[in-house]
C-alpha cells in the first residue's frame, strides 16, 4: 500500500471508507475526546474534525483506531502481514550472511528492501511553506486538545520529537507528550531511559550550560510515526525503517534554527531548545491506565520557530483506560514482536499482549518446552531482550497446547499446572513505568512470572497428571451421525 505523506494516506483511507469528515463545530476541549472514544470503541473510522471551535486548523483523530489502519500505515493490507515486518526487523537486528547462491537468492528481497534505507535530503520542503518565529510564535493558535476533565492543560500527544546526542550521527525519534504552559513553551515529558532523554543527558555532559536543540514534527506520515514506536534495531534509524515500510526513501529537510532533520512532508514543525536546568511540574493527566498520573518535574521546551504546510492538519489523540489508540497499536505491533522474539528464542510459539493489560503490562507466552527450568529462561528473556518489555509486570508462560490468546485456555493452565510457591517468580527492584502508581516507589517496582507449563522431572517429585484424550474411533462414529441427531435444529 503506497503513499507519500499523511495527506496521501488520508485519501486512501477515505477511498476505503476508513475516514469520516466531521463538519459540525466540535470543541477540542473534551468534546473531541468523547466523540473519538465512542468511535474507537465501535471500531469506527479515523475522524477529521474540519471545524474545531475557536480554530481554523482541522484536527485529525483516531488515525490508528483499528489494527487494520495500523497495518495500512505500515504498508500492509492486513494485520497478519505484520509478521513479515517483524521477520524483516529480526533479520536486520541480527543479519546472517548467505550460506550459498540459493540462500543469497532467497535473501534478495530482504537485501533489496535494505537499499531503501537512506534518507533523501531536500533543500526546501512542504513543512516550511509558512514560517513563524520570535514574537509570532503562538502555540495557542493550534487546536491542542484537552482530553479529560481534570487534565492540567492542553496536551500535544502525537508529537514526533527529534534529537541527536553530541557524539552521534543518528538522530533519535520519540513520541513524548507535551503540556502547553505558554505561547512558546511546552513541558517535554520523557522518561530517563528514553532516547531523547539520553541524548539530552549526553549533551549536558559534553556541553554544560548550553542549550539543547530539539524539534518536534506534528502530522508526519504514518510510516515515520510508527517507526518511532516499533522495536527498530539500534543500528537502524527510524527514518530508514520508515523508508522500508513505505518502499521509498524518507524525505527530510534541515530545520531553520538547528541542524536536525525533520520529515519534509510533516504538517507542522516546532523548532527550539531546552535550557539546562529549566524544569516545570507536569500533569496531572488522564493516561492509558485509566487513572490520572502524579505531578512530576520535566524539562521545558522553548519553541523559537513554527513552520507548517499550507492548510495544515493538526494530528492528535487521547489516552485512557483501554481500548484507546495506544492499546490498538499494541494489538497490531504484537504481530511485529512475535518473529523478533522467535529469532532469539525459537522455542516460542506465540506471544500475546492482551489490550486490557494496558498494552504491555502483562504478556502471555506459549513455547515448546525442552528441559526443566526452560520456562523461567524464556520468562527472563522476555523481560530483557527488547526495551519495549522493560515495564512488563507479569509474564505467563504456557506450553504450546495452550492458546495464548484465549483466557479460558490460559486460566486452565494456571490453575492445573502451577503450584503458587514453586512456580511463581518474583523479582524486586526492577524498572517500572512511572505512571504505575501501584509500585511502592516511582519508577521502581517488582515483576511476577508465572510458570504454567507441564512440569518435568527435577521440577516436581510427583507423577504428573495424564491428560484426558478422547477415543478417536468414538469421535469418528459420532461425527458420522451428528447431523442426524439434530440437537441444535
Swiss-Prot record:
Keyword terms: Cell membrane, Decarboxylase, Flavoprotein, FMN, Lyase, Manganese, Membrane, Metal-binding, Ubiquinone biosynthesis
Listed pathway(s): Cofactor biosynthesis; ubiquinone biosynthesis
Per the entry, the cofactor note is: Binds 1 prenylated FMN per subunit.
Instruction: Provide the residue positions that the database annotates as binding Mn(2+).
Output: 172, 238
Q: Which InterPro entries match?
A: UbiD, UbiD-like_C, UbiD-like_N, UbiD_bacteria, UbiD_Rift_dom
| Protein's cellular compartments | Cell membrane
- UniProt GO molecular function: 3-octaprenyl-4-hydroxybenzoate carboxy-lyase activity; metal ion binding
Biological-process GO terms, alphabetical: ubiquinone biosynthetic process
Q: How does it sit in the membrane?
A: Peripheral membrane protein
One GO cellular component this record assigns the protein to is: plasma membrane
Q: What is its EC number?
A: 4.1.1.98
Q: Which reaction does it catalyse?
A: a 4-hydroxy-3-(all-trans-polyprenyl)benzoate + H(+) = a 2-(all-trans-polyprenyl)phenol + CO2
The answer to whether UniProt assigns keyword Transport to this entry is: no
Its predominant location is membrane
Instruction: List, alphabetically, the Pfam families matched.
Output: UbiD (PF01977), UbiD_C (PF20696), UbiD_N (PF20695)
Entry cofactors: prenylated FMN; Mn(2+)
Q: Which residues form the active site?
A: 287
Coiled-coil parts of chain: none
Residue positions annotated to bind prenylated FMN are 175-177, 189-191, 194-195
Q: What does this protein do?
A: Catalyzes the decarboxylation of 3-octaprenyl-4-hydroxy benzoate to 2-octaprenylphenol, an intermediate step in ubiquinone biosynthesis.
Family (UniProt): Belongs to the UbiD family.
- Give the protein's recorded name: 3-octaprenyl-4-hydroxybenzoate carboxy-lyase
Q: Which organism is it from?
A: Salmonella arizonae (strain ATCC BAA-731 / CDC346-86 / RSK2980)
Which classification does the entry list for the species? Bacteria, Pseudomonadati, Pseudomonadota, Gammaproteobacteria, Enterobacterales
Amino acid at each position: 500500500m503506497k503513499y507519500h505523506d499523511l495527506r496521501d494516506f488520508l485519501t486512501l483511507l477515505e477511498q476505503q471508507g476508513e475516514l469520516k469528515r466531521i463538519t459540525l463545530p466540535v470543541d477540542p476541549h473534551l468534546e473531541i475526546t468523547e466523540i473519538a472514544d465512542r468511535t474507537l470503541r465501535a471500531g469506527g473510522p479515523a475522524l477529521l474534525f474540519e471545524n474545531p471551535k475557536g480554530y481554523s486548523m482541522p484536527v485529525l483523530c483516531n488515525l490508528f483506531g483499528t489494527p487494520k489502519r495500523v497495518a495500512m500505515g505500515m504498508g500492509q493490507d492486513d494485520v497478519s502481514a505484520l509478521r513479515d515486518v517483524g521477520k524483516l526487523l529480526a533479520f536486520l537486528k541480527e543479519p546472517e550472511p548467505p550460506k550459498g547462491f540459493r540462500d543469497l537468492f532467497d535473501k534478495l528481497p530482504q537485501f533489496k528492501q535494505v537499499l531503501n534505507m537512506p534518507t533523501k535530503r531536500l533543500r526546501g520542503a512542504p513543512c516550511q511553506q509558512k514560517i513563524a518565529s520570535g514574537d509570532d510564535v503562538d502555540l495557542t493558535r493550534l487546536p491542542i486538545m484537552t482530553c479529560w476533565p481534570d487534565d492540567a492543560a492542553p496536551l500535544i500527544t502525537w508529537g514526533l520529537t527529534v534529537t541527536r546526542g553530541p557524539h552521534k550521527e543518528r538522530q533519535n525519534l520519540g513520541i513524548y507528550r507535551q503540556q502547553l504552559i505558554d505561547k512558546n513553551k511546552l513541558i517535554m515529558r520523557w522518561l530517563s531511559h528514553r532516547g531523547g532523554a539520553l541524548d539530552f543527558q549526553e549533551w549536558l555532559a559534553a556541553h554544560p550550560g548550553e542549550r539543547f536543540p530539539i524539534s518536534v514534527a506534528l502530522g508526519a506520515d504514518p510510516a515515520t510515526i510508527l517507526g518511532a514506536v516499533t522495536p527498530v534495531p539500534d543500528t537502524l534509524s527510524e527514518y530508514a525503517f520508515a523508508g522500508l515500510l513505505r518502499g521509498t526513501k524518507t524525505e527530510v529537510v534541515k530545520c531553520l534554527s538547528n541542524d536536525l532533520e525533520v520529515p519534509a512532508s510533516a504538517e507542522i514543525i516546532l523548532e527550539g531548545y531546552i535550557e539546562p536546568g529549566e524544569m516545570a511540574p507536569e500533569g496531572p493527566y488522564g493516561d492509558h491506565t485509566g487513572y490520572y498520573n502524579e505531578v512530576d518535574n520535566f524539562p521545558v521546551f522553548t519553541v523559537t520557530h513554527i513552520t507548517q504546510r499550507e492548510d495544515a492538519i493538526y494530528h492528535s489523540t487521547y489516552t485512557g483506560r483501554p481500548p484507546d489508540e495506544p492499546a490498538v497499536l499494541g494489538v497490531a505491533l504484537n504481530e511485529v514482536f512475535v518473529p523478533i522474539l522467535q529469532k532469539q528464542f525459537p522455542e516460542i510459539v506465540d506471544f500475546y499482549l492482551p489490550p486490557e493489560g494496558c498494552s504491555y503490562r502483562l504478556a502471555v507466552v506459549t513455547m515448546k518446552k525442552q528441559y526443566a527450568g526452560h520456562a523461567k529462561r524464556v520468562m527472563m528473556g522476555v523481560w530483557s531482550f527488547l526495551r519495549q518489555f522493560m515495564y512488563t509486570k507479569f509474564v505467563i508462560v504456557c506450553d504450546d497446547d495452550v492458546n495464548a490468546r484465549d483466557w479460558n485456555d490460559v486460566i486452565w493452565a494456571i490453575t492445573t499446572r502451577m503450584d503458587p510457591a514453586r512456580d511463581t517468580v518474583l523479582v524486586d527492584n526492577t524498572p517500572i513505568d512511572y505512571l504505575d502508581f501501584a509500585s511502592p516507589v516511582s519508577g521502581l517496582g517488582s515483576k511476577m512470572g508465572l510458570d504454567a507449563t507441564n512440569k518435568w522431572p527435577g521440577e516436581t517429585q510427583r507423577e504428573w497428571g495424564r491428560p484426558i484424550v478422547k477415543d478417536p474411533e468414538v469421535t469418528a462414529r459420532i461425527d458420522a451421525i451428528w447431523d442426524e441427531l439434530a440437537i441444535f435444529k
